[in-house]
From Swiss-Prot:
Name of the molecule in the record: Protein YihD
TM helices/strands, residue ranges: none
Membership in a protein family: To H.influenzae HI_0845.
Signal peptide: none
Any Pfam family matching the protein: DUF1040
Gene Ontology cellular-component annotations: cytosol
Name of the coding gene: yihD
Source species, domain of life: Bacteria
Organism of this sequence: Escherichia coli (strain K12)
Coiled coil: none
Amino acid sequence: MKCKRLNEVIELLQPAWQKEPDLNLLQFLQKLAKESGFDGELADLTDDILIYHLKMRDSAKDAVIPGLQKDYEEDFKTALLRARGVIKE
């Protein structure tokens, strides 16, 4: 599991970092942390924050978070009925 997440971080990090070649790795990670709204110590920055921020970085502000689109419902009533099993796929 850790190996898969590491590969995912590297895949997402490489093209983003290449766009900012003047920054070293720590400076770039600090920039990503600040962009994502993380205000703790850099050592506490999780891979989840990096992965989701890198995935969403160049998307529209109102875009749906990856992984949540499949569960998205336009209206609350439909979502509730589907969750209770009244509406089947």
